[in-house]
Every structure is written in structure tokens, then in C-alpha cells.
Amino acid sequence: MNICLLDESGAGDGALSVLAARWQLEHDDSAPMALVLTPQHLELRKRDEPKLGGIFVDFVSGAMAHRRKFGGGRGEAVAKAVGIKSGYLPDVVDATAGLGRDAFVLAALGCRVRMLERNPVVAALLDDGLRRGYADVEIGPWLRENLTLLHASSLSALTDITPQPDVVYLDPMYPHKQKSALVKKEMRVFQSLVGADEDADGLLQPARTLAKKRVVVKRPDYAPPLAGLTTPNAVNTKSHRFDIYAPLTR
């Protein structure tokens, strides 16, 4: 994949070259997107809109730490949707990991979550966030146990992941109507990089074949059901719904 690669870390240790080789990224000085290594983290920038700033994964501080400490915990909609109960913490495959927010919430509640991400740039951002999270004194011990990353296409990986998860979680990219600053910023940067998940409908059947207990699909409240398949089971919030599907027998 071609992207502008910039090293602003000041370290001069060749880390960016190693990263590019690992994720098979080719430097393109004319690319509209830049992957930038700063002294703090790896971040993604939209070069023609510098005011948007950089997108990066941070499990240790900021919004994710606040959600972990002060969010709804097991009362969060995503926790209810995957079926967390007293004494039951499902094993989850998040097949559309993105920036890992929902996966992190589930991991913080005690679920073991395997994240799938097919875009190499997004996978590199996730890997960088995990590396810093694993090294953190407070969250590192349980994060290493509960949250891992697999760089692979969900369409192919869902057919051969072992062991089978209890739950497959899907949150395909869908155009957002909301104009909140964060959504607007992230969606503009992300859609410039990966576009819409046009093959997302094809994920539902392999997800239902893989999952032992259920498949959960997060959708904006105005979006049609994935693959046009309605389900009577859902957890609803003000702006989203989590459609719940039974597994298919193999």
C-alpha cells in the first residue's frame, strides 16, 4: 500500500523503515495520507486538511481511559449486546476493529478479544496503541491477556479462526449523519484512507458460521440491517442499535 511515510520522532533509529517493511507500506511523497512516527506515537494525517490533526490509538489515556473508568461498565450497550453476565465473559472476535474502541471496552470488562483489521495502515496504528498499552503499569497486565490483533481480511479469516469465538462482533464503516467534531474528523480521515466497507454484507454469513453463541452487528439507527437481514433481537441506544443474530450450524 502506498502512503507518505514521515519520521518526526527524532530518534534516527530506522524504526519507520522497519515498520514500513512489516506492514508492506511503500513511501509515496504525493499520497494524500501520511503515516507519521512522532516521539509519542504513530499517527495518521490527511495532508490536505492539517487542521484535522492526527488520528492515533491510545488505550492508556484520553477518551478510552475515561470510558474505562467512568463509562457504564457492564451496563454499556456493547456489553449487553455480546451477552456479558455475572459469571459469563464471552470470547469475542471483533472482525472490523477500526481504532479498537469497542474491543477495548470488552477487554476491560474481562472478555478475551481478538481484533481483525485488514487495512495495513489501520493495523499499524492498532499495533502501536497495543504496544504502548501493553507497556503501561496499570492496564498492561490484563490488556496483554485480553486484547490481541490479527492483520487479516475478515472475509477470509472468519472461515479459519481457531479456536471458535463465542461472539463475532461487526461494526462496518457506514456514512455518519452526525456532525460531532470527533466523528466528523475521524470519518473524514478514515474514509479518505479506507472508503466504505462495500463488501460488508458478505461478512454476516461467515460470522454466523464461526460464532458459537451469537453475532452482533453495530449499526447507526438510520442504517438498514446488514445484508438486508432483519432480526427481532437488538440492543438500542440513542444513535445506534446492536443487531443480534443466532449462529448458523456448520
Swiss-Prot record:
Catalytic activity: guanosine(1516) in 16S rRNA + S-adenosyl-L-methionine = N(2)-methylguanosine(1516) in 16S rRNA + S-adenosyl-L-homocysteine + H(+)
Molecular functions per Gene Ontology: rRNA (guanine-N2-)-methyltransferase activity
GO CC terms: cytoplasm
Domain of life, per lineage: Bacteria
Keywords for this protein: Cytoplasm, Methyltransferase, rRNA processing, S-adenosyl-L-methionine, Transferase
Keyword Cytoplasm: yes
Residues that hold S-adenosyl-L-methionine according to the record: 101-102, 117-118, 153-154, 171
HAMAP family noted in UniProt: 16SrRNA_methyltr_J (MF_01523)
Protein name (Swiss-Prot/TrEMBL): Ribosomal RNA small subunit methyltransferase J
UniProt EC number: 2.1.1.242
Family label: Belongs to the methyltransferase superfamily. RsmJ family.
InterPro entries referenced in this protein's UniProt entry, alphabetically: 16SrRNA_methylTrfase_J, SAM-dependent_MTases_sf
Gene that this polypeptide is encoded by: rsmJ
Subcellular location: Cytoplasm
Functional note: Specifically methylates the guanosine in position 1516 of 16S rRNA.
